[in-house]
A protein has these predicted regions:
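Short, small-residue-rich loop/turn micro-motifs
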Residues: 25-28, 166-168, 247-249
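Active-site nucleotide/adenylate-binding loops and adjacent lid/helix of ATP-dependent enzymes
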Residues: 13, 18-23, 74, 79-80, ...
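Short acidic/His/Gly/Ser-rich catalytic and metal-binding motifs that mark active-site loops
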Residues: 30-34, 170-172, 238, 252-253
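Hydrophobic residues at beta-strand termini and immediately following loops
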Residues: 67, 147, 181, 229, ...
């Protein structure tokens, strides 16, 4: 009989063999088969990623159930299926709060899931809102302006160079070497293009040159633990000055 803690606030399980853990995910191949393009599905996962997660959980002695994406989760819940815990890596497809949809649904059914809750997911996907909260908390973040319409472009009063990207995307979607902006003409061109393509506001911020790192953190406050640090180094044939969609999509070559 053991006690095991999962990365969910205050969640402990005492068990003699296993915990039934549901896996929620967006499988990229499924969406490509439905006709979605590669950029739209850029954040979604591959089969080998799901296999690796499932193997790791099973190696810890737990039972796994593959659920799938949001609509598949809705169907399973309607059928009366339940799990002790859900390991959620769903990105979602529709809406600016799409990453919060699976956690919110599970909260309604009182089924715990790993990682952030629905509120945190909704706040952090919107980079403008995230930066506003960080700034008001007194933490350093690059000066920024959120461009919601073409008319807002003239309101940007930040010195060049600037960096522009969709306010609520990931995996480099909407990011390219053109994202580094050095003139008012470039600012209008890039923002207009992003507003039309992604149908959401554009985050414009002071360009920060230099080295780029990704730091994995598990937990909150005093319980936070750094899992590892990764430095992004672009090769000579990569798009420069930006960890772009192309660089991420073709990472093995870049």
């Amino acid at each position: 009989m053991g006690t095991e803690r999962f990365p969910v606030t205050g969640l402990f399980f005492s068990h003699g063999g296993f915990v039934k853990i549901g896996l929620t995910f967006d499988l990229r191949s499924e969406y490509l088969a439905m006709g979605y393009d590669r950029e739209t599905t850029a954040e979604f996962d591959r089969e080998d990623t799901i296999d690796a997660i499932e193997t790791a959980i099973r190696d810890c002695g737990h039972q796994t159930v593959r659920i799938g994406h949001l609509r598949q989760l809705v169907s399973r819940l309607a059928e009366g299926q339940r799990w002790d815990l859900v390991f959620n890596i769903c990105e979602g497809l529709h809406g600016i709060g799409r990453e919060a949809q699976v956690p919110a649904l599970l909260e309604g059914y009182q089924i715990p899931c790993v990682f952030a809750d629905s509120l945190m997911m909704a706040v952090c996907l919107h980079k403008g809102l995230t930066k506003t909260l960080i700034d008001r908390a007194g933490l350093a973040t690059a000066p920024f302006h959120v461009v919601a319409t073409v008319a807002d472009i003239d309101q940007v009063q930040l010195p060049f160079p600037l960096f522009a990207k969709p306010v609520a995307e990931g995996t480099g979607k909407g990011v390219s070497s053109a994202s580094v902006i050095r003139s008012a003409t470039e600012l209008r061109t890039v923002c207009t293009d992003l507003l039309q393509r992604f149908r959401q506001p554009v985050l414009v911020e002071t360009f920060l040159p230099g080295r780029e790192f990704t730091v994995g953190i598990l937990g909150t406050g005093e319980d936070a633990t750094v899992l590892g640090t990764l430095e992004v180094k672009l090769l000579s044939n990569a798009e420069q000055d930006a960890y772009s969609y192309v660089n991420k999509e073709r990472y093995a070559e870049m």
